[in-house]
From Swiss-Prot:
Keyword Secreted: yes
Organism from which the protein derives: Apis mellifera
GO biological process: defense response to bacterium; innate immune response
Annotated protein name in UniProt: Apidaecins type 14
UniProt xrefs under Pfam families: Apidaecin (PF00807)
């Protein structure tokens, strides 16, 4: 089966390489023949309706609006620009005119959050007592006994070594 497939491949290759014995280039290119359209009859001369091209979609239209002619002075409503959102407004408020002396309420600045509040630095001449809390003792589970000093001969309990296990 393998030899049969190999023989087919060899024959195909030989035909493809050596099959075209005409080495001269063709003198003129081959032309495809097309059928001609039927000729119009003399009585068949009625006009053909060609529809107008559709205007582009309004959302896709990109050309500018047509300019108004000078004779066509129709008033056009142009809305006022919307003011910016109050939280996004960044420009300064307009200055009050001297004739308009209405009192303006300006709220007091808010104090900082208690957790973010910092005490002012003490001045060198101000000697008020400052409460400094004692350092917290370590957690009982993390507490370590202090190391014995060499001059302190406190008896230290050293347990006896355990006897070996009977099965070992």
């Amino acid at each position: 089966m393998k030899n049969f497939a190999l023989a087919i491949l060899v024959v195909t290759f030989v035909v493809a390489v050596f099959g075209n014995t005409n080495l001269d280039p063709p003198t003129r290119p081959a032309r495809l023949r097309r059928e001609a359209k039927p000729e119009a009859e003399p009585g068949n001369n009625r006009p053909i309706y060609i529809p107008q091209p559709r205007p582009p979609h309004p959302r896709l239209r990109r050309e500018a609006e047509p300019k108004a002619e000078p004779g066509n002075n129709r008033p056009i409503y142009i809305p006022q620009p919307r003011p910016p959102h109050p939280r996004l407004r960044r420009e300064a408020e307009s200055e009050a005119e001297p004739g308009n002396n209405r009192p303006v309420y300006i709220p007091q600045p808010r104090p900082p959050h208690p957790r973010l509040r910092r005490e002012p630095e003490a001045e060198p001449g101000n000697n008020r007592p400052v409460y400094i809390p004692q350092p917290r003792p370590p957690h009982p589970r993390l507490r370590r006994e202090p190391e014995a000093e060499p001059g302190n001969n406190r008896p230290v309990y050293i347990p006896q070594p355990r006897p070996p296990h009977p099965r070992i």
